[in-house]
């Protein structure tokens, strides 16, 4: 028996037309390197929510290699700004390189450090 959550998940996934090739490559590499990134159903949900809500500002805590920030950057409005925080020193240069390569509009700002400290310094909007 298909539950309500399964139907909703199936509906949201049916709206997803896939990712841009560079995101597919990043996802493949992340899986190979065992870097945690968001799953396919979460990717579809994020795209759906971005299309519905059209946020102007997004805060992400924990970007790993930058996959989800880049996904949100490409599937959000042109004037959307994304602030992402990462503390794992090994992943920060990889995320920064990915943002330099794939964020030509500079929608994404990477803050380095512990989110509990950085969040105290941020102002709304």
Regions found by a protein language model. Give the residues of each.
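A short alpha-helical cap/connector motif
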Residues: 1-125
